[in-house]
């Protein structure tokens, strides 16, 4: 596999790269390429300068999907000349493996999981779908103030997307922004997915997201995939601001929520569903998938008489995720 990849990197024309996906792993591409039939490209653990990625992209004129995973040294990812590019995926878990800025006016789908601060979205004006989250090491004692502003700036660039997926860490940061009184943008999203468990550090952010999404038709809640920032980061930040964490994490109706994700009972699930109903206007469907690992009751006990609001279809299910 390594020899094959080196051959491709050193070749200027690869006519056999037609409709299949192609992946470069742990390489340092240095020359120009001419992959005129390539539609899907994945670069993982590569050393990429701005000039290098520009050369690669210029040699892929019909590229439709680009994945960058843990690629170092990239500063500005300029995709303005990739006219047919529709899907961009970026993942990293250390600071220098993400571009600082993204210029991608033609993409329709964005999947972004970055370390700490997100990439600055300079131009994503054609975006229809976005999935975003961030990774922060659990040993941190508090949150850096700049991260709140960076996340809110990113949200402004996602305002027109019809489908949004937010991870648990993003929701916790948004909750902190909400209790600190920072302004939120309005959204045109019609389908919102929240990848989170139910606990106090996500409630204020979820409330505000729902209130600021007046066109929302479908909301889906599914368990997070781990790597959750500890609550002390947010409590310590509030302490430094002179705020009382025990008061701040209440929902707007005064409910005190569970601090831990574990031991989730039927009462809290009912309150969560009611909270989402109260904060949406034209919702058609709500899907709540609960992590069976954190439940202290069986699903059959979670059949309360939810207040019906505009005949919203409510679906409850469980999954086992550690």
Curated annotation (Swiss-Prot):
Residues in coiled coil: none
Pfam families linked: LRR_At5g56370
Boundaries of every F-box domain copy: 45-88
InterPro entries assigned to the protein according to its UniProt record, in alphabetical order: F-box_plant, LRR_dom_sf, LRR_FXL15/At3g58940/PEG3-like
Protein name: Probable F-box protein At1g60180
């Amino acid at each position: 596999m390594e020899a094959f990849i080196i051959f491709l990197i050193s070749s200027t024309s690869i006519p056999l790269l037609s409709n299949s996906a192609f992946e470069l792993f742990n390489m340092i591409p240095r020359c120009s390429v001419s992959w005129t039939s390539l539609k899907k490209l994945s670069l993982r653990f590569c050393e990429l300068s701005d000039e290098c990625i520009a050369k690669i992209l210029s040699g892929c004129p019909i590229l439709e999907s680009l994945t960058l995973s843990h690629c170092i040294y990239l500063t500005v990812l300029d995709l303005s000349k990739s006219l047919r590019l529709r899907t961009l995926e970026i993942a990293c878990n250390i600071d220098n493996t993400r571009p600082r800025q993204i210029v991608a006016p033609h993409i329709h789908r964005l999947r972004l999981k970055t370390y700490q601060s997100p990439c600055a979205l300079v131009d994503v004006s054609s975006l229809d779908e976005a999935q975003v989250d961030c990774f922060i090491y659990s040993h941190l004692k508090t949150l850096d103030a700049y991260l709140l502003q960076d996340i809110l700036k990113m949200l402004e660039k996602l305002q027109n997307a019809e489908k949004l997926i937010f991870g648990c860490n993003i929701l916790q940061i948004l909750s902190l922004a909400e209790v600190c009184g920072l302004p939120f943008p309005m959204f045109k999203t019609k389908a919102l997915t929240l990848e989170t468990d139910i606990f106090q550090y996500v409630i204020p952010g979820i409330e505000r997201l729902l209130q600021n999404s007046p066109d929302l038709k479908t909301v889906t809640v599914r368990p997070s995939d781990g790597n959750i920032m500890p609550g002390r980061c947010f409590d310590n930040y509030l302490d430094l601001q002179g705020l009382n964490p025990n008061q701040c994490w209440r929902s707007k109706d005064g409910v005190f929520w569970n601090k831990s994700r574990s031991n989730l009972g039927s009462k809290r699930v009912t309150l969560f569903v009611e909270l989402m109903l109260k904060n949406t206007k034209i919702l058609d469907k709500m899907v709540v998938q609960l992590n069976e690992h954190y439940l202290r009751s069986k699903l059959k006990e979670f059949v309360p008489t939810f207040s019906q609001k505009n005949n919203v279809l409510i679906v409850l299910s469980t999954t086992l995720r550690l």
